């Protein structure tokens, strides 16, 4: 017998291959609301981060692909030839299988009538072709010895020494969940777990009479403890009604994720409304990823090793979602929730306290889950959810090895993709002995399992081929008797076997089922003697199991192929497969439900603190505040929110001892948080906007918060006509009406606009403390007066745009003044000289009216406010031109006055007028600079 390494090493040919399924019973894990629900169709594996994920948003909320259910197959119409213990069954010539030891090929021919695809349902009218006979020593003569801790196989021949022994032990880590630790994993929605394992072994023998041999099996220890069992399971039949998914006996711990119970076990505490709308547009996906079931993240999904795909998605539920509304989640079209059965149920989404947020149903055609929200969404706000979805390769869609897929998962309108390659294992071979097998279905209603076996898939010339199917395993058993259904199909020369080891249409192959070469053994087994073959064959075995057996914990069935290598010496080789479905429950199973874990509450009161002292009930006018949003944040970062009732009360239930939670109070509009931690009584003080609370074995109903109404303030005040242009309001100066005044925030955004009244007054009310900008629009035809004149801020002008800060008080000091643009008289003085050009507008109090021509080298540009009417025009290019200019003037009439005296008077008046204009011009220039 050849000893080979376990599947994990893959350094040498595999001695034993096994498919194992296991059911684990433990509680539905809770998710926070932020919910986390682990959506686990099948067995969960260790989590690994996605290697290459591409997230994209799509608008279509429905899957376009229509996929058929690969498991809806029936074999109720199949007919089997029968051989009973007490009688033989006549068959036609077409269904005879004649065995000739000297012929290299069997004449195995049979035409199957009305073949349909099989399931594990057993027709009560269907009989088997098995006949119980004494064990023939010339057939398979290996005796299996059970060893709990190791497995061995040996290879011996007349000229070959025995190979060294190898031992393979696979163990599963215990699954325990501490309720006191902060668990970022949102949920362990786990009610059961099913593991499938394949074990293959090769044996070489050189003698007909053999000593006992030990078949190499993979030994797997099962988890011994799970917490929080939520229902009593009285027998294995109930366990089998839980979902079933492939697994195998690789050496690695089991994840705490699992499959879900069957739909008949699903109950809803709060049923959603019957009517609702699809609200995918109100679901915001914040994170999603696809990871491989094993930790290698190599992009290869080992489908025969039950490696799965894990879809994680975190999303937020809009507060507009109501009870009865629905959202959708799509798994990839090339995957299935379970590879063994349709008896799975979608887990309910719950928060950490156990309240149900949504319930789900699955549409296999569209590969779509529809979640219906309960009235939970009507009670709570800011709901966040997390789903963990586990699925397996749909072998009906992916029959070939090394198939590359671009898988896509989608929640609501957001999808994520990942590229993977599907890998199937190769047959177990030992010289000409070569085979592979898998459990392909389990029927928990009729208590049957279906095993699909490939015999000689490599098309070797196999001499004296004998196949033994045994229900006696090291870890479990099936029932091989006259109720066992066995069908045999021959694969034609031009036909290929699917690499997936799954047959969905047996009618494509030649049915060669015959009773002559199949005989029941004495040890819960059956032998099928094929003789000499060189074609592949398919064996479909449907056998029963006993779910009520006291020590029944697993289903295991073994198939062994033996071929003769040397007809003269009797040397032969064997290759074996073990297929296992293991059932185990947590400790305490059968003793009733574990008592529920004690949980605690946090509350309690939000009030209006009229006297702003931070202590409740110190003022008769203090009252509760309703509709205040209060948020509880769990240790894992998830959260949920409620609003205070009409009495100002709030409460969060279902909180665990020893954990620390954060309570946050939203400040109501128009209110300000009061003082924190005032006084000596923590039950009457205020915690402020947020506080961390640790549960220490009791409820904490002292988490209160007080608020007082935020005072409102006003801003103004006056725009006046500054007749004296001094920038200070005078008693006789009047207000200007109709001036536009704009109030802005500190960023320049307009808050409000008003106009001054008939008295020049304006006012903005209901303002909070803060920074503001006041802008005055200058009236048409008026000029801004001097700003910030004098020492009284309430009497001066503040200018066109004023920055104002309000701090707990009104501000009625924001004023502005204007005067008319045309209040100045005209006085023009133009002077041209060699050195200067001067324009002078002067108003003086002089009553003179004179014209004079003068020479001037002054540089001046002046305006005066004198009231005289005096025009002085002087054009001078040089001193030589003065006499010439004077001569061109018309003479004045003779008034009888002294000519010299008049000339001197005129000259003196002109000098005074020029001096006055110069002084007044300088004054105006200074005022302009000041303005």
From Swiss-Prot:
Q: Where mainly located?
A: secreted
Annotated organism of origin: Staphylococcus epidermidis
Q: Where is this motif: LPXTG sorting signal?
A: 892-896
User: Propeptide per record: which residue ranges?
Assistant: 896-931
Supply the SUPFAM superfamilies for this chain.
Answer: Bacterial adhesins (SSF49401), Hypothetical protein PA1324 (SSF117074)
Q: How does it sit in the membrane?
A: Peptidoglycan-anchor
> What's this protein's name?
Serine-aspartate repeat-containing protein G
A cellular-component GO term for this protein: extracellular region
* Ligand binding A region: annotated span: 51-597
Q: Where is the composition biased (Low complexity)?
A: 147-157
- Reply yes or no: does the keyword Heme apply: no
Q: Where is the composition biased (Acidic residues)?
A: 789-799, 818-878
Q: What is the effect of changing residue 339 to A?
A: Loss of interaction with human fibrinogen
* Encoding gene (name): sdrG
* Keywords assigned: Calcium, Cell wall, Metal-binding, Peptidoglycan-anchor, Repeat, Secreted, Signal, Virulence
List the Gene3D superfamilies hit by this protein, alphabetically.
2.60.40.1280, 2.60.40.1290, Immunoglobulins (2.60.40.10)
Where found, per UniProt? Secreted, Cell wall
- Tell me the lineage of the source organism: Bacteria, Bacillati, Bacillota, Bacilli, Bacillales
